[in-house]
A protein has these predicted regions:
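Coiled-coil dimerization/phosphotransfer module
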Residues: 1-124
Length: 124
């Protein structure tokens, strides 16, 4: 999908859901996962001037893995003061006992990886 965002050039959005099982999360867990993905996309648009943003969701036996990646300007994670958005992402993932990692380099984009336990519910 491509969208014009905030009057800027068109941004290519790619969404890949490779989860085959039926998943059910508590409202707290679901909202926290949603908000972290939302913040990652918002940062890509607002700060990185990305022209392509990808969200990839995969699963293992007990984990769900989410990756938000962009081709934007990136940043030096060691010399950048983390703002409220990145701190809030960490707090949200901590709240659901998950893990988050952020990899970024100047002019090479950013990759945010989230891993958390999945709760399985058989839905008829």
């Amino acid at each position: 999908m491509t969208f014009e965002v905030l009057g800027r050039d068109i941004i290519q959005f790619n969404f890949n859901n490779n989860v085959t099982s039926e998943l059910s999360f508590s409202s707290i867990k679901g909202v926290n996962i949603f908000r972290v993905i939302q913040e990652g996309i918002n940062n890509s648009i607002k700060y990185a001037n990305a022209t392509e943003i990808s969200v990839n969701i995969t699963e293992s036996d007990s984990k769900i893995n989410i990756e938000v990646a962009d081709n934007g300007s990136g940043f030096d994670i060691n010399s950048t003061e983390l703002g409220n958005g990145l701190e809030n992402m960490q707090k949200r993932i901590d709240e659901i006992n998950g893990e988050i990692s952020i990899h970024s380099e100047n002019n090479k984009g950013t990759i945010i990886k989230i891993t958390c336990d999945k709760n399985r519910t058989n839905v008829v």
